[in-house]
Amino acid sequence: IRDDLVTGVQTCALPICDDLQSLNERVIPTLLGRIRPEARRLLDIHRHANRSTFIVSAAPQEIVEPLALSLGMTGAIGTRGEVHDGVYTGELEGPFCYGEGKVEAIEQLARWDNLDLAQCYAYSDSSSDLPMLSAVGHPVVVNPDGRLERHARRNGWPIVHFRQRSRTVIRRVLAGVATTAVAAGAFVVGMSVG
C-alpha cells in the first residue's frame, strides 16, 4: 500500500486547491452520511470528557482534515504531500501515515501538545494499526479484522462491534479515500487535554 501511495504522490504534479476542494465537496457529504451512529457517540464521549480528537489516516491530509472538522473533531493527521508554489512536488512531507508512520505522527503530536500517550485512546479495525494501538494506553478495536481481534483478545483490549453495516461494505465505500477510520471508529485517537 505504501509503495502505491508514494508512487502516486511521486508521479503527481498537480495544482492542489481546485481539484481537492472539488473532490471534498463531492466526497465529504457522502462520507458524513455513512458514519456509524456508534462512532459519532464515541466522538461525543471524548468531546464531553474534554479530549482532543483526531483522525489518523494514510489518506491525504487535504482530505482527512476537512472530514475531521466536519465531524467537530480537533483535526486530522494524514499523509502530507510536499507542495511548492501550489503544486505537489511528488515527494512526501513527513511520515507516510501508515503502520509505524502513524506512531511517528502521534508521537510528534504528543510532543507538540505535551500529551502523554499512556493517557490517550486509539480506535482501529485493522491489524495494520497494531503499532499505533500498542503506542497508546487505551487501545480499542472496532469491527476488527481476524488478526487484530486475536491480538486484542490475547492482550485484553476492548473489542467493539458496530451493528448494521458490515466492515466489507464500509471498506468498499470508503476505500478510495482510505477513511474507514471514522466510519468504523478506526484510526481515531482521542487525547486527554489538560
Locate the predicted segments by residue.
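Single conserved hydrophobic/aromatic residue that forms the stacking wall/gate
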Residues: 1-12
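Membrane-proximal helical "anchor" segments flanking the first transmembrane region
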Residues: 11-19, 175
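C-terminal cap/substrate-recognition subdomain and adjoining C-terminal extension
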Residues: 21-23, 29-194
